[in-house]
């Protein structure tokens, strides 16, 4: 399926980033922010030919004069008009394809409401005239990308995190746990603790700078208390970062205090369990006979699992919770930022998958509810 003529399209719509490309490729061709920006003031500059909305990178680069909105909140689409703009931009500007010529594989959050799947299906067939489409659960695709069909996926992106136990390719809905703690919260927390150090970041534009600091300098400590002592007694953990205006700031214990919130949500004033405990709780909701397979196949996925040190810390924390002789293995593939997309690319190019597509004809006969019968 390497010729782009009839290749299926794979679009992973995350809360923070859209990953899009062609089935059979090993990485997405287009990765851009899931944002739609509208001008704050009508016609700031005369004769600019201002558009009424900008999507993705265009919105990002003009963020000074725009109000930015994310149509996907906590992994779930909340604004369909803006979502349509994002898809339109994906097809026509990023991938430069005619959507009516390619089957399209979309991804959805675990526990996505039924009405949402139907709406997605409807838009693909009615607005974009897709010849065929399919909706797959994000975590399941990540597991496929790691070469497994059984395991538990901890998927953490920008807007939401999930633990999803999967057995023989099927997600076990009763054991899926959702954690409203993800990249955006960690960025906000870093903004807050940098403010305590005397650096203020407040606007949406400045938040993007902080996100960059987070991605470049933060890491997860194996032993938080000990790391705090090291940071207090020496400057070995300090790193400097140059802001766009040339000012250089120094950050020390913030580097690991910030992602520590994943393990201790109380840092953010949240009462929920940390990611290690959530994983453990999710496994404990599964049948006792498959727990061994889940402990031995714990797969990390999504951009917020990219912190250095997260896998070792996860191993340590889950080992402490699990039965003493249990074999625990945390799998953290280097490309996990894109593993949902990669899994989709693998799935959509399998010869056995070709009969799974929902065709335009089936949609015309059954309507949007066809998605519940064909995608699960």
Curated annotation (Swiss-Prot):
Top-rank lineage group of the source organism: Eukaryota
Cytoplasm listed as a keyword: yes
Reaction catalysis annotation: ATP + H2O = ADP + phosphate + H(+)
InterPro entries found in the cross-reference section: Actin, Actin/actin-like_CS, Actin_CS, ATPase_NBD
Expression (tissue specificity): Expressed in several different spatial territories of the embryo.
Keyword list, A-Z: Acetylation, ATP-binding, Cytoplasm, Cytoskeleton, Hydrolase, Nucleotide-binding
Gene Ontology molecular function: any one: ATP binding
SUPFAM superfamilies assigned to the protein according to its UniProt record, in alphabetical order: Actin-like ATPase domain
Localization per record: Cytoplasm; Cytoplasm, Cytoskeleton
Pfam families listed in its UniProt record: Actin (PF00022)
Functional description taken from the UniProt entry: Actins are highly conserved proteins that are involved in various types of cell motility and are ubiquitously expressed in all eukaryotic cells.
Annotated family: Belongs to the actin family.
Name of the molecule in the record: Actin, cytoskeletal 1
Organism: Lytechinus pictus
